Design a protein with these regions (language model features):
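Thiamine diphosphate
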Residues: 2-114
Length: 114
């Protein structure tokens, strides 16, 4: 470059940094869902198998969505696909999720509110 020129005056050709990949739409694309139902669906899609949580007013719609999901998807033995384990307090839920993740190698999910 010459003195007084900048890169915008003479841009270099850009090389592609990533390839675009066509992905099929999600099986539930277009279905009307609440925010709480979306949270549960994302957890399911990510392979979450257990949730640890302590209920409070702000998180109740999400808990209701977990219960609805479990009712709709129980296995033949009647087991819930994503059990919700409720400890004595919020701190316990966090410790349980962390311990579960370390012991199992799976994602530990803690859902609490203040």
């Amino acid at each position: 470059m010459k003195l007084g020129e900048n890169r915008l005056d003479n841009p270099e050709p850009m090389t592609p940094r990533a390839q675009t990949v066509e992905t099929p739409p999600h099986p539930l694309a277009g279905k009307r869902m609440t925010g709480a139902e979306m949270i549960v669906q994302v957890l399911v899609d990510e392979g979450v198998q257990t949730i640890f949580g302590y209920s409070g007013g702000a998180i109740l719609p999400t808990y209701d969505a977990v219960f609805r999901y479990n009712d709709e998807h129980r296995d033949e033995a009647g087991n819930a696909p994503i059990p919700l384990i409720v400890p004595a307090n919020e701190q316990g839920a966090g410790f349980m999720a962390a311990g579960y993740a370390r012991a199992s190698g799976r994602v530990g999910v803690c859902m609490v509110t203040s």
